[in-house]
Amino acid sequence: MLGFKDKIIESHIELYGDPDSKTNNQYSFFFFSKIEFKENDIFQIYAKTAESRIRAGWLFPVSVLGSREHDFWENPHFSVYAKIGGGILTSYTGDDLSEDTHILILKDATIAEYDIYVENTAVSLLKHGYYPIVNGAKFHNSLCTIDNNETKNISVEKHPEISSHIPYIPKLVQEFLPKTTDPLSRFISIYQVYELLMEKYFHYKIDEYRALRATIGTIREKISDLSSEKKLIQGVFSHCKLRNNIDENERALAKNLFGTDKDDAYYKGLQLQSLIYDIRNAIIHNYHKYELSDLMRDIAERMEIILFETLENSQVSALLAKAPAPQPYNSR
């Protein structure tokens, strides 16, 4: 009996002829898992830079390589990549492909010219529900979706500062999130990013005061102002101009979690920075008090969406990459 990959290859040959693997060395490919999808989930990938938006490749379910039951069957641009995909499948020796597998094919010349690689664009795909396949593990976030009825394109942006300045973040998005299914573990690992950002912000502010040649007394006073985690996360949100208003789903999550422990004024004035911090406190200090086991998946899924939004923020990248050069202390 033919396995999944062999069935696709057999059908592919009937549709496109024998695969030509000679052109494969001009392209890079990556496999992703996405559990809930439609066969029509075929997207052109565009590399988004400060100056332009360039078509870099295609992303589609592996299953469409052996099918004509989709909208792109007669698209000449897709056909080129479908034939390349057939060659990739023919030479691929792994046994980790399944009906949930999607393939991203990028033209090497384009990604080299614009420095667009999976390693520095992972967030742009994760937020749509495409997780790297890690040791066969698969995770599905019901909030990470993209509707092919609304768009046929996915734009990817590079975030090199994130990879080079905080190694934990690429490890989180490329390895930990794809294979970890426990929502509590996911939340804790996601919140670590905000703790890292708070640490970065703290040192950024201290270096800023030093650059201004502030006195030690002034610096001590400023350190005291930055001593609490609540003030630090407020500082991160303000400095990076992150979204602070909450949507109705986030407000509903807060009400489901805290109930009557918080009054109407709290829910009415709730900001995102406070929601994140308060959820963290509830989990760390009062896990036994709230019905967190029933809410943890919703909490983790929404925190993941917020995390991706944070990592795509240009001010976050700037915070990670830049800080004033240290100056000698003025002891007077």
Please place each PLM-identified region on the residue numbering.
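Amphipathic, oligomerization/interface secondary-structure segments
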Residues: 152-332
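Charged, non-catalytic interaction/linker regions at domain boundaries
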Residues: 1-182, 196, 297-301, 305-332
